[in-house]
């Protein structure tokens, strides 16, 4: 397995010590080479692979600056149990953010003085408070409380929509005119934008056709010109 390899360097220390032990001239000190002491501490390896020494990580001395308290005067983040519930509700119902809300409060504790056991008073943020009441008072899980409060919210929205439709029908029976709704206004704006784009597209198409016709005419002219020159030379 080790045929053709030289291992004489593995016994260089023994050879050097043996050479220094026998002196030709008596009463003289042998000249010790400088590398002999280093070779005594770090002898040559007896295997063909170099051993990898164990790496010891020294503890990092960060100094006294690391022991000082940080963010001592920074205010802590205020977290309420309703925050996560509110985030989940508005993630599932993003259009509720577009509805007008009553933001006028006395001291910011109006929601705590309400009796949430009697159902929803104002949809939206009230769904979160109703869900929290189910979790704290009734002991329901988070998903179950959200499901119950959400169904109450849908039922209340359906009642409001039915009342609104009935009121509009009754008013129209007495001759009231409400004008265009949001859907009709949006369709008119969309039609106007489409007609404007149609005019622009027609102009662009005519420009492209004119450029294509002009390019074809130039190619025909360059092909017919040499033929006319040949006829003139023959004449």
Swiss-Prot record:
Pfam families named in the record: MRP-S25
GO cellular component, one term: mitochondrial small ribosomal subunit
UniProt keyword annotations, A-Z: Mitochondrion, Ribonucleoprotein, Ribosomal protein
Annotated stretches, region: Disordered: 51-71
UniProt subcellular location: Mitochondrion
InterPro entries for the chain: Ribosomal_mS23_fun
GO molecular-function term, one example from the UniProt record: structural constituent of ribosome
Annotated family: Belongs to the mitochondrion-specific ribosomal protein mS23 family.
Subunit structure and binding partners: Component of the mitochondrial small ribosomal subunit.
Listed name of the protein: Small ribosomal subunit protein mS23
Species: Chaetomium globosum (strain ATCC 6205 / CBS 148.51 / DSM 1962 / NBRC 6347 / NRRL 1970) (Soil fungus)
């Amino acid at each position: 397995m080790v045929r053709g390899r030289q291992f004489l360097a593995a016994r260089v220390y023994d050879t050097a010590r043996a050479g220094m032990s026998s002196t030709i001239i008596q009463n003289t000190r042998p000249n010790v080479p400088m590398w002999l002491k280093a070779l005594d501490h770090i002898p040559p390896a007896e295997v063909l692979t170099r051993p990898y020494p164990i790496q010891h990580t020294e503890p990092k001395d960060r100094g006294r600056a690391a022991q000082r308290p940080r963010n001592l005067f920074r205010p802590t983040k205020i977290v309420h149990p309703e925050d996560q519930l509110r985030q989940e509700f508005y993630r599932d119902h993003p259009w509720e953010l577009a509805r007008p809300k009553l933001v006028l409060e006395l001291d910011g504790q109006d929601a705590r003085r309400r009796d949430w056991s009697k159902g929803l008073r104002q949809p939206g943020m009230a769904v979160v408070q109703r869900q929290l009441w189910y979790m704290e008072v009734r002991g329901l899980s988070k998903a179950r409380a959200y499901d119950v409060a959400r169904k109450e919210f849908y039922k209340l929205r359906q009642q409001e929509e039915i009342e609104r439709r009935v009121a509009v029908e009754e008013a129209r029976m007495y001759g009231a005119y409400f004008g265009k709704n949001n859907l009709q206004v949006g369709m008119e704006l969309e039609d106007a934008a489409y007609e404007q784009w149609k005019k622009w597209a027609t102009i662009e198409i005519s420009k492209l056709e004119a450029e294509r016709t002009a390019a074809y005419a130039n190619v025909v002219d360059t092909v017919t010109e040499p033929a006319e020159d040949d006829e003139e030379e023959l004449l």
